[in-house]
Amino acid sequence: MNSVPSKLEKNNIDELYRKNQVKSVSFLVILGGVLLLTVLLSLRAGSYETPIGELIKGIFGMSDDRKINIVVQNNRLPRIVTAILAGGGLGLAGCILQAVLRNPLASSSTLGVSQGATFGAAFAIVVLGLGATDGLGIPMCAFLGSIAVALVILGLSKFRQVSPEGIVLAGVAISSMFTGATTLIQYFADEVQLSTLVFWTFGDLGSTGWEDLGGMAVIVAILCTYCFAHRWDYNALLSGEETAISLGINVKRLTLVGMVLCCLCSSVVVSNVGLISFIGLVAPHIVRMVVGNNHVYLIPGSILGGATLLLLGDLFARTVISPVILPIGAITSFLGGPLFLYLLFKGGKKQ
């Protein structure tokens, strides 16, 4: 029997691919539009109510009201940029962790990577006595904490052949260990250190200024560039490690570099805004439901989705009981937890 596809079958495949391509691109455009709309809504949110036209002028310092320029440039705009960088970075990190571990439940929060980074930051503040003026001390300790967790997860996945569900359970155990260790450090902290540590556990997008965003922007840009350059490698990895190797892909290097960059991104986010949970899990899954597993669209979609979700969460936190601003970490955990349970039980039901 002839196994070569007929011309009609090829045409059907091409047509199906084109339709999926149009759907994916359209979804990314819509997602970008939603992000832009959320940015405009976030600009308006606050006790100082201003017409949107004046706010847009304030971005460039062109408003006739000097107070508007100050509020927009020094308060609202840095908060929005922080949410976009942190949310986009966490969304992409979750997408890549799910690809290299071939685990749909993987993310920096469910695997304990973010909790390891939080412990590293707490250790730097209380035990080493470092502060915000000590340069890269706190981010470096946060990175070491996250990379320690990543090495454990990588070892369990590659060398012990633990199942995807087992990896998630190991991540829960590791998260509990590092959360307990962070709590012990808090117990021995003085009042100033304790108030700083509360920031890490609650999450706060409003404490960063323009001078703090440069490092996070560079790390997120490096992660985005590397991952998009290897988008076809991640697609090949979906077919299995053996298939990827047969196509000439260095799977070990792809996995290791991807995990290191994801840990670096998670640690720099934790260092700047504290512990933000579930964005890296939720964003890739929402995008995947529309565009599928093609990383050509999944990678930019996860970036846009993560940025939009975190910005929406921050908008909710700032407006639900205004003028009180709720901690963004609590909001993302409250909204992301039920989805995590849904994905977990859905996966178990299929098996």
Enumerate the language-model features and the residues they cover.
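Alpha-helical transmembrane segments in inner-membrane proteins
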Residues: 1-351
